[in-house]
């Protein structure tokens, strides 16, 4: 493999979501956004609910977008592995389902706030964040 190429694998309990070569990856960790290049220093970090951007070596003008709902990222030599609870490529996102999830979460958030249930508010805010992330990533089609 070329020195300017790395392999990215995104894995969920349902299986491998993404397995391709890349020459640049952007991810949001719990400590902020990072840009990943081939042969970077080894790192392990927690991931936020956010989009993952992947620039592939076969078409540098094209970016693959993946909705990642938290997890961990490990960078070692020319292999980047992401293990996430769930992840979807932008082309695989069911937009109407994501819209319905957003509406459900917004309604549940109103109820939880009215009832002042702090644990429920946090849970529903995460669900809303996931739905908004999926909608944002799907807009890159």
From Swiss-Prot:
It comes from the Bacteria. It is found in: Cell membrane. The keyword Signal does not apply. InterPro entries: ATP_synth_F1_dsu/esu, ATP_synth_F1_dsu/esu_N, ATP_synth_F1_esu_C, ATPsynth_dsu/esu_N. One of its GO terms (molecular function) is ATP binding. GO terms for cellular component: plasma membrane; proton-transporting ATP synthase complex. Keywords: ATP synthesis, Cell membrane, CF(1), Hydrogen ion transport, Ion transport, Membrane, Transport. It is a peripheral membrane protein. Produces ATP from ADP in the presence of a proton gradient across the membrane. F-type ATPases have 2 components, CF(1) - the catalytic core - and CF(0) - the membrane proton channel. CF(1) has five subunits: alpha(3), beta(3), gamma(1), delta(1), epsilon(1). CF(0) has three main subunits: a, b and c. Belongs to the ATPase epsilon chain family. This is ATP synthase epsilon chain. It comes from Lactococcus lactis subsp. cremoris (strain SK11). The lineage of its organism: Bacteria, Bacillati, Bacillota, Bacilli, Lactobacillales.
């Amino acid at each position: 493999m070329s020195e300017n190429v790395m392999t990215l694998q995104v894995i969920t309990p349902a299986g491998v979501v993404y397995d391709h070569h890349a020459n640049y990856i952007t991810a949001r960790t719990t400590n902020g956004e990072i840009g990943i290049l081939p042969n970077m220093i080894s790192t392990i970090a927690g991931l936020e609910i956010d989009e993952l951007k992947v620039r592939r070596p076969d078409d540098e003008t094209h970016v693959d977008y993946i909705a990642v709902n938290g997890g961990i990222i490990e960078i070692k030599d020319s292999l980047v592995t992401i293990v996430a609870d769930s992840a979807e490529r932008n082309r695989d996102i069911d937009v109407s389902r994501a819209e319905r999830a957003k509406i459900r979460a917004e309604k549940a958030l109103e109820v939880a706030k009215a009832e002042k249930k702090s644990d429920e508010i946090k849970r529903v805010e995460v669900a809303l964040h996931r739905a908004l992330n999926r909608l944002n990533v799907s807009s890159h089609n």
